[in-house]
């Protein structure tokens, strides 16, 4: 492995591939591959590789990008045409992390390039090797292809994005980009707009009406038949089927006799309704018409399609359609609708009953029979017995005139009802250490005195106390004699 690094030529120039999973640093070989490196750096400075995707991934082989169309067939060259492959004896695809140019079928290069994911000696001499991955960014390359799901062999389902190819060190002093990134973006937008306009004009030209060919032998009849405009909206079987034997060719009969003698056909009629229709049709059919129909062997009943169409068109004669099943269905439907909703008479009766009940409650006179109040020393059973003795009744009609009396004094009474007085509250101030109730004279004597007066008062009190002590010490014999006596 060391011999491989020794044989490789020194690199000059550095670029960064900014991908969706990190940055990959690449050192270039501009001396051994000048055409490829100059083309690669110029396209990078012009912003050609910005926001592309890695459109091809072969595990343990290569990771390819550089095609704006993401199909593997696009790309461009700064030379105006593809340039040839540049091979060198000291550059070989013998490990992963090598940068090479993707060649066309005619062994020429444009803008597509790839990174090797393993040793690929079969590519040596067939593709231009122009760079290698530098430093720890090789781990970013490994992470870039890890866990990628492939479809159609080598296309990632969710392609990895190449945000930018940033030129860190340019090895060519005379290299100048043909245009800036902003100019390239504006040019791409202009080309895209021109392409969209061209496509819209082509579609409009195709939609334009072609000129009729009047030289046909049928004098343009076939041409007119081909140019029929297709109608939009729902179509019936008459529009789609030209010669259908299941469709009726007879016109709809609207005479009164036909309507009177033809029962309507409905798929939703029950057996009971069918019997009613049979009776009504037999009773309303004249005998002459019946005989004539039996002789001819034909029936005057129209096709079901015509019958349904006549039903949708609406009745034309009220008297003639009175015996048909349609009127029967209408009457049954009206009967059902009338029975499904509550009648207004029942609602009025319920409302009047409610009003009468409210009036009885409000007009009932209050009972004047006194009810005994329970005493605190009397039990519950005794209270019930006394209530029965004093006229308490369990009548059902008497509950409306009953008055609830809980007894006792009212909570709010008198003139000061609802008003607070000072006697209702007791103020306890923990900061007040004096006892005003026990020594009211001292409290009253304090009123009107200043701080200096209080100092003189305390001094006088101390002098009186010291004088009493001195007198007590001068006459101990007199105190002893007094105690003996």
UniProtKB/Swiss-Prot annotation:
Catalytic activity, as annotated: [protein]-peptidylproline (omega=180) = [protein]-peptidylproline (omega=0)
Composition skew (Polar residues), residue ranges: 249-270, 278-292, 315-325, 353-370
Record field: compositional bias (Acidic residues): 381-398
Keyword Cytoplasm: yes
Basic residues: bias regions: 466-485
Top-level taxon: Eukaryota
Record GO biological process: mRNA processing; protein folding; RNA splicing
Region of interest: Disordered: 173-485
Gene Ontology cellular component annotations, sorted alphabetically: catalytic step 2 spliceosome; cytoplasm
Subunit field text: Associated with the spliceosome.
Family to which the UniProt record says this protein belongs: Belongs to the cyclophilin-type PPIase family. CWC27 subfamily.
Protein name (record): Peptidyl-prolyl isomerase CWC27
């Amino acid at each position: 492995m060391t011999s491989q690094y020794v044989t490789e030529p020194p690199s000059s120039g550095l670029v960064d591939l900014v991908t969706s999973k990190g940055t990959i640093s690449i050192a270039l070989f501009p001396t051994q591959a000048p055409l490829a490196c100059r083309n690669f750096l110029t396209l990078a400075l012009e912003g050609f590789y910005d926001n592309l995707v890695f459109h091809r991934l072969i595990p343990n082989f290569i990771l390819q990008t550089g095609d704006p169309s993401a199909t593997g067939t696009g790309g461009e060259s700064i030379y105006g045409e593809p340039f040839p492959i540049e091979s060198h004896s000291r550059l070989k695809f013998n490990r992963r992390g090598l940068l090479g140019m993707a060649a066309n079928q005619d062994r020429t290069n444009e803008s597509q390039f790839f990174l090797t994911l393993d040793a690929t000696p079969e590519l040596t001499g067939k593709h231009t090797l122009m760079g290698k991955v530098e430093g720890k960014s090789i781990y970013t390359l490994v992470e870039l292809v890890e866990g990628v799901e492939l479809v159609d062999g080598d296309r990632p389902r969710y392609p990895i994005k190449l945000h930018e190819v940033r030129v860190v060190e340019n090895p060519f002093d005379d290299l100048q980009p043909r245009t800036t990134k902003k100019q390239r973006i504006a040019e791409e937008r202009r080309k895209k707009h021109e392409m969209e306009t061209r496509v819209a004009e082509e579609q409009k030209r195709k939609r334009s009406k072609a000129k009729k060919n009047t030289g046909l032998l049928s004098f343009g009849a076939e041409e007119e038949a081909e140019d029929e405009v297709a109608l939009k909206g729902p179509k019936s079987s008459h529009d789609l089927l030209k010669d259908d034997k299941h469709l009726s060719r007879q016109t709809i009969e609207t005479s009164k006799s036909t309507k009177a003698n033809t029962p309507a056909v409905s798929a939703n009629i029950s057996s009971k309704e069918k019997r009613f229709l049979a009776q009504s049709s037999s009773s309303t059919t004249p005998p002459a018409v019946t005989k004539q129909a039996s002789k001819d062997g034909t029936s005057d009943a129209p096709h079901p399609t015509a019958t349904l169409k006549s039903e949708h068109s609406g009745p034309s004669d009220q008297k003639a359609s009175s015996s048909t099943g349609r009127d029967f269905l209408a009457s049954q439907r009206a009967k059902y609708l009338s029975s499904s909703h509550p009648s207004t008479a029942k609602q009025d009766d319920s409302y009047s009953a409610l009003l009468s009940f409210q009036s009885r409650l409000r007009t009932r006179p209050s009972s004047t029979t006194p009810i005994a109040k329970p005493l605190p020393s009397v039990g519950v059973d005794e209270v019930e017995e006394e209530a029965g003795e004093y006229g308490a009744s369990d009548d059902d009609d008497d509950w409306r005139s009953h008055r609830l009396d809980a007894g006792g004094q009212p909570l709010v009474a008198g003139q000061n009802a609802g008003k607070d007085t000072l006697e209702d509250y007791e103020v306890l101030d923990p900061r007040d250490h004096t006892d005003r109730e026990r020594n009211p004279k001292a409290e009253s004597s304090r009123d009107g005195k200043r701080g200096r007066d209080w100092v003189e008062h305390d001094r006088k009190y101390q002098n009186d106390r010291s004088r009493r002590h001195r007198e007590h010490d001068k006459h101990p014999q007199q105190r002893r004699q007094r105690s003996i006596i």
